[in-house]
Structures are given as C-alpha cells and as structure tokens.
C-alpha cells in the first residue's frame, strides 16, 4: 500500500514540476484525476514537438463550461457531460469541445479530458497563434 501511495505521490510531483513552467491555472471543481490529465494534455500541447511554445512562467488560464449534463437512472446509471474547455494564454483564446460518458461525474470528466488531444486541429491552431 505504501509503495502505491509513494508511486502516485512521485507521479503527481513529476507532473506538477513538468507543467509548472507554464503556470497552468485549472479550476478546483474538476476532479483530481481529470485535472492531472488536463495538465498533461496542455503541457504536451504547449511543448509543440519538444520546443516550448511560450516562455517559462507564462500563465495559461484554463476554464470550462458544462453545456449539458445528463444522467440515466437505475442500477446501471451513467453520467454524460458535454464540456467546452477554454484556454487563454498571452491574449490568445481557444475552445476545445469535449464529451465524456462515465459511471459517475468524475469518470465522465476523466473520459472527456481523454478526448482533448494535444495534436487536434483546435490545439494546433492554438499553438500556431501563440508562436
């Protein structure tokens, strides 16, 4: 058990240090696993193939808007989320529409954030405008 906790502590520390250069500002309302993955996705996006797109310490504000939330009742209930993730960096704005369906809201968030691809058309456009 201690080894597992130590592994996750090291993982979160590495992710935090890795993304700290960009000062990602992510809302606390997002479940922790989804927030960690969101940090990884934006870090990958902003590194643009191994080269930093923005200078160290540049703030990147990430917000979200839940467009739709649906829940199916019953013993096999699921939650579906339609979300728009909004990013602002150096005056450049981008919106990334994502959806996720999961067993609960945290799972739906995680599945939605997995669909935020660092090399998507929206991400590439955001990175090009930052350069």
Feature-to-residue mapping (PLM):
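A structural "domain/chain start" motif
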Residues: 3-11, 15-49, 125-131
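Generic alpha-helix initiation/capping and coil-helix boundary signal
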Residues: 2-10, 87, 101, 105
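Solvent-exposed, acidic/flexible segments
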Residues: 31-39, 78, 102-110
């Amino acid at each position: 058990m201690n080894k597992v906790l130590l592994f996750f502590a090291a993982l979160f520390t590495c992710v935090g240090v890795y993304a700290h250069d960009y000062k990602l500002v992510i809302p606390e309302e997002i479940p922790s696993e989804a927030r960690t993955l969101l940090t990884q996705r934006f870090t990958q996006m902003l590194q643009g193939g191994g080269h930093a797109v923005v200078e160290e310490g540049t703030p990147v504000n990430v917000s979200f808007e839940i467009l739709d939330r649906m829940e199916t009742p019953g013993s096999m209930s699921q939650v579906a989320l339609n979300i728009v993730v909004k990013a602002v960096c150096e005056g450049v704005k981008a919106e990334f529409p994502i959806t996720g369906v999961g067993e609960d809201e945290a799972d739906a968030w995680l599945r939605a954030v997995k669909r935020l691809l660092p090399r998507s058309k929206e991400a590439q456009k955001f990175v090009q405008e930052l350069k």
